[in-house]
Amino acid sequence: MPNVTFEALDYTGERTFAPARYRIDGDARGFTVWRNGARWLELGPGYRLLRARACGVCSTDLARHHLPFPLPQVIGHEVLALDERGERYVVEINASHHARGLADDCPFCRSGLPTHCPARRTLGIHDLPGGFGPWLLAPIDACLPVPANVPDSAAVLVEPFAAALHAARRLQPRAGDRLAVLGPRRLGMLVIAALAGVRGERRQGGEDFGVVALVRDPQLAAMARTFGADRAQVVDDRASELPEGAFDAVIDTTGNPEALATAVRLARREVHLKSTHGQSSCGLRQLTGLVVDELTLAPFPVDASGFEASCVTDSERPRLAWLPDAAPPAWLPARAEVLRGAPEALAAVVRRSPHGLPRADLAVAASAAEVDAAIRPVTTNEAPLVRPRGTILVQSSPTSASPLLDAITSRSLRLSSSRC
C-alpha cells in the first residue's frame, strides 16, 4: 500500500502560503489524504500516486482565492510527474469517472463531456493536492507518458498548450478571418502557437487566416511573432488606437476583468473568453462560471430559422429555460420544450430529467441578472442551469447596463469560452 508523508505549502484564503503536514495512503481501491493529523479527503478508486517533478504557474493559480472552491489547498495543475519507475507523465487535470477508468452511468461522461462531469475533482484547483507539493494523486486514465525526446521544460507546457489548442478549435476560425489575441503572456502566447498550428492545417486545404497579437509591453511583440503571430501591435490598456470592430474575432487571454470591454469593442463577430479570474466584468458576476461550463452568449434569433442554428443538441425539441417576464414568441414552443419559472426552480426540474443531460440545452435572458442566473441559479451552489457548451440567448433590453449584452443584441456579437 503506498504511504507517503510530506510537507507542502497550502495556499490559503488570506492569499498567503502556510506549511502543512500531509500523509497519503491507499491503493487502487481508494486513497485517504490526511492533513496536519486529521482526515482531509477520501477518494474512491481510479487514482495513482505520482511524484511531482515540475509544475508551471498559471493565471488560475494567481486568481485561486477568487474561485468558488474551498481553501486551503496545495495548488498547481500544470504538472510533470514521475511514477515509481521514474517514467515521466503529464496529467489531464479533471478527475471524472471517465478519467478514473470507472464504468459509470454518468450522462456527462457518456455524452463525450468528461471534463464537465459534475462528480469530478480537479488537480490543484478543486480538492486534489496539486503540483506545488512533492506528491499528487492523478486519475489513472489521464496520465499521458512523455516521449524521451521531449525535455522537461516543454513537457510542463503540455497542459496549458492543450487548453490553448482547445480554445483555437472552439473558436473555429474562418477563411480570411483577422484574429486578435489580447494580452498574450503565458497562456496567450500558447494560444498564438495553437492558432498557428490550426492555420498550418488549414493552409494545406487552401484556407488561411491572420493572427495579430495586441501587447502593452514592446518586449512581448517579438516573442508573439516567434510563437506564430503575423503581426504584433503595441497598444495602451484600452487599445484606444484601434477602431471598433477592427478584428473578426478577439481572444481575451489577459486574466484581467477590465479587458473584456476592450475585446467586445474590437471584435466584429466573436469574443472568445479564456480567463477565469473570478471577478465581475461588463455587468456580469458569473463569467468564471460561464468559462468553467464553456458556455456561449448569442443574440436571440428573430425567427425560427435562426433558432435552429443556436441548438447544441441532437434532440428535435431541446429543453429551453425561458427567464424573461415577457412571453416567448409563438413559433418557439413548436421547436423547443419551453420551461418557465424561477431559475433555481427550473434547475431542479431539469436535474430530475430521466433522459439526456440533466440540464437545459439553452436559456433565454433579457438582462445581466438573468444571464448570471442562467449560469449559476443559486449563487452559493456551483450547479448550473444550462448544459456544458450550451448557449444563453440574449434578448434586447433597454436597461441591460452591460456593454457586452448591448453588443450581442445590437450588432449580433457572440461570446464563446473555453477552459482546460
Where are these predicted regions, by residue range?
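NAD(P)H dinucleotide-binding glycine-rich loop of Rossmann-like/cofactor-binding domains
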Residues: V33, A95-L182, A196
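Glycine-rich beta-strand-centered segment in the early N-terminal region that forms part
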Residues: W34-C55, H66-R110, P147-N149
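Hydrophobic beta-strand signal
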Residues: L49, L80, V90-E92, A180, ...
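Cytochrome P450 core scaffold surrounding the K-helix E-X-X-R motif
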Residues: T60-H65
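Mid-domain Rossmann-like dinucleotide-binding core that forms the NAD(H)/NADP(H) cofactor-binding site
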Residues: V150-D237, C311-R351
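A short acidic, Gly/Pro-enriched loop at the edge of an enzyme's catalytic core
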Residues: E241-V250, S353-A363
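Glycine-rich phosphate-binding loop and adjacent beta-alpha segment
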Residues: P257-R319, P324-R351, A368-C420
